[in-house]
């Protein structure tokens, strides 16, 4: 039995210099698991609650000492002595202990740190790499990365309304070569921006954040960078967007306001706007193309683009099986973004991935804009054979930690490692 004998929660800092929760779980055998949780900037209203202290005199109210205290007291008492290999039972214990629908009492940040640390300790105890512990012998597929090379919206201080412009290398036969492709495009883009006298400063997720006059200008520049790096847009590399449309949706008026372009659009008009971009550029994936509460708009977008473009629900589904089930039944979107801190335990995370796959939806494993050096999501991506990962640009060590872990996993898998390329979009025609 892998009995838990000690649990230590602590406050550490994330990639934005804000406090977050880290947890150590020690087992009877002496092995330890350590995990740190991320934090988002643009968040869905139905995400599990991240517990913050609210003391404005300390870290501007963003301290997490209450969450840490919950780990070191209540949670510790509840799971001390339990078997770390019983992940589902441990997570259910945490959920029952919290007793709320949104994990607002103990805090999803406290619960997730414990859930992850327990899994890492159990994997160590079993002598297995984490991806293998999660997925067993069937875990062998590396994910296609969504590489966020231009940041806008809530992730940058510029004129772009769309939050993320991403490249997805798809013609390569290994993750290593896909990563090289993305890195070369990133550096080609930096040179193009510098030559134009545009900013090469990076945003929260490591992408550039220059002031483009329009979304089309940004996309054209990315296509130039792909070609400058020696690749073919539409063949070797596809494009992806994260609109984060909830951030510029005005519910009272029912309009999407693209301030950077001086546009006010209805849901139908915004769906047409996105369809026009897909006609002009090799866009294979659009995340949060409509606001989380605009389900009619989502239905319009899905009917218009859902057979040829991956439509990913992030704020829409918030990694929640109840909401995802409703979306599947109504034919909303065709993919879910998986963010472990939106739901707060690994068991619930895996349930959302499984539900998506059974319905023919894709699942994209994702970081948050406020990250840490923790690379668990890389192991989740391979352990679940998700096929896609979204973990930032080709700069900032908090993003590189995930990419480098995927390189290690691919090396560990050896000849049985596979890279899906365009096959990652198994539900598109």
From Swiss-Prot:
Needed cofactors: Mg(2+)
Pathway the protein contributes to: Carbohydrate degradation; glycolysis; pyruvate from D-glyceraldehyde 3-phosphate: step 4/5
Cross-referenced PROSITE patterns: ENOLASE (PS00164)
GO cellular component: cell surface; extracellular region; phosphopyruvate hydratase complex
Keyword Secreted belongs to the record: yes
Active site per the UniProt annotation: 205, 339
Subcellular location: Cytoplasm; Secreted; Cell surface
Textual note on the cofactor: Binds a second Mg(2+) ion via substrate during catalysis.
A Pfam cross-reference name: Enolase_C
Positions bound to (2R)-2-phosphoglycerate: 163, 339, 368-369, 390
UniProt GO molecular function: magnesium ion binding; phosphopyruvate hydratase activity
Enzyme Commission designation: 4.2.1.11
GO biological process: glycolytic process
Entries under InterPro entries matching the protein: Enolase, Enolase-like_C_sf, Enolase-like_N, Enolase_C, Enolase_CS, Enolase_N
Listed Gene3D superfamilies: Enolase-like C-terminal domain, Enolase-like, N-terminal domain
Disulfide pattern: none
Signal peptide, first to last residue: none
Ligand binding (Mg(2+)): 242, 287, 314
Function description: Catalyzes the reversible conversion of 2-phosphoglycerate (2-PG) into phosphoenolpyruvate (PEP). It is essential for the degradation of carbohydrates via glycolysis.
Family membership noted in the UniProt record: Belongs to the enolase family.
Record HAMAP family: Enolase
The name this protein goes by in its record: Enolase
């Amino acid at each position: 039995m892998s009995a838990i004998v000690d649990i230590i929660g602590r406050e550490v800092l994330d990639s934005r210099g804000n406090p977050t929760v880290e947890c150590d779980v020690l087992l009877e055998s002496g092995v330890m698991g350590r995990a740190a949780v991320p934090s988002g900037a643009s968040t869905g209203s139905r995400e599990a609650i991240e517990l913050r202290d609210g003391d404005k005199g300390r870290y501007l109210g963003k301290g997490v000492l209450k969450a840490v205290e919950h780990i070191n007291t209540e949670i510790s008492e509840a799971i001390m002595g339990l078997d770390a290999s019983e992940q589902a039972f441990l997570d259910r214990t945490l959920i029952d202990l919290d007793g709320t629908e949104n994990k607002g009492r103990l805090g999803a940040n406290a619960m997730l740190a414990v859930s992850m640390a327990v899994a890492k300790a159990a994997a160590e105890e079993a002598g297995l790499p984490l991806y293998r512990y999660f997925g067993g012998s069937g875990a062998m597929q590396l994910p296609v990365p969504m590489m966020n090379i231009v940041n806008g919206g809530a992730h940058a201080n510029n004129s772009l309304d769309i939050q993320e412009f991403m490249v997805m290398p798809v013609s390569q036969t290994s993750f290593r070569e896909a990563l090289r492709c993305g890195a070369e495009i990133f550096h080609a883009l930096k040179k193009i921006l510098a030559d134009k006298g545009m900013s090469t400063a990076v945003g929260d997720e490591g992408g550039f954040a220059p002031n483009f006059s329009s979304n089309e200008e940004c996309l054209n520049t990315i296509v130039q960078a792909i070609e400058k790096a020696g690749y073919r847009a539409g063949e070797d590399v596809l494009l992806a967007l994260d609109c984060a449309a909830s951030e510029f949706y005005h519910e009272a008026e029912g309009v999407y306001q693209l301030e950077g372009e001086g546009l006010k659009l209805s849901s139908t008009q915004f769906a047409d706007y996105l369809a026009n971009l897909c006609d002009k550029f090799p866009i294979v994936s659009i995340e949060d193309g409509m606001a989380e509460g605009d389900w009619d708009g989502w239905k319009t977008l899905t009917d218009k683009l859902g057979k040829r473009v991956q439509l990913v629900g992030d704020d829409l589904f918030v990694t929640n099986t109840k909401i995802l089930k409703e979306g599947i039944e109504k034919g909303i979107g065709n993919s879910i973004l998986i963010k472990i801190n939106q739901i707060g335990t690994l068991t619930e995370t895996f349930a959302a991935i499984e539900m998506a796959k059974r319905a023919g939806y894709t699942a994209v494993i994702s970081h948050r804009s406020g990250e840490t050096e923790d690379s668990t999501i890389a192991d989740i991506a391979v352990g679940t054979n998700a096929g896609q990962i979204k973990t930032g640009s080709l700069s900032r060590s908090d993003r590189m930690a995930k990419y480098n872990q995927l390189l290690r996993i691919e090396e560990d898998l050896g000849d049985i490692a596979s890279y899906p390329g365009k096959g990652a979009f198994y539900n598109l025609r």
